[in-house]
Amino acid sequence: MTSVTKLLRMAATAMALAGATSGRAALYEFQATGGGHYTASWSGPAQSIPDNDLSGVAFALDFPATGLRITDISVRILITGGWNGDLYAYLSHGSDYAILLNRVGAFSNGADGYSTSGLNILLQPETTHAGLADIHTTQNPDAPPTGYAADGRVDYTDTSRPQTLDVFPDRDPNGSWTLFFADRSPVFGSTLNGWSLDITAVPEPVNPALGCFAGMFLLVTLVRCERVRRLFRRP
């Protein structure tokens, strides 16, 4: 497949993700928990993931704080029942999106994926957590605190993984986020029991040019004030 075709396919996928139907009406707002950490979470009541239904279940989130830059991000997911090889999930913010799950264990020569049932996992970026195993090839993942790398595959048959959680560090977290889950194959429905999204963020660095301009403006202001005072002190 050519690089141009690949890019077009990724763009089409991103557009499809942006148009996903929301499955819940509530808006989940990130809360500051101290030390630059912000968390949004949901723990039920349990939500069935519609079986073999691409509309899935979507959660709308909002990050109200401004002037920040993401340094780390993690997603915890708790799912029971079903067939893990059917599951698909993504996290999106603006034009950026990460594919969290894409039919774990499914390959071109085995499209059913892993038959294991239920997931209790922590997904993290590989750039900030070295040595993570790829969740797509992990049949029986350990529960947190063990972390795994998000799937990242646009198609479950891909070998490249451009859409992992590594797309988010250095981005501005402010604004709307979407967390989406779907079951892409018939039989063996899964139940979503909870999730949490944790973001670590720091203040945006001051632009050196703006800082220099501000310093010059302050200096000029002080000089002018001194000149005015001298005028009033003249006999």
Task: Name what the model sees in each region.
Residues 10-19, 215-216:
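Bacterial N-terminal signal peptides
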Residues 204-224:
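A short, hydrophobic C-terminal helix/tail in secreted or cell-surface proteins
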Residues 219-235:
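C-terminal membrane-anchoring or membrane-association module
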Residues 26-201:
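Loop and turn regions of beta-sandwich accessory domains that flank beta-strands and are enriched
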Residues 2-11:
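Bacterial N-terminal signal peptides that target proteins for export
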Residues 21-25:
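Sec/Tat signal peptide C-region and signal peptidase I cleavage site
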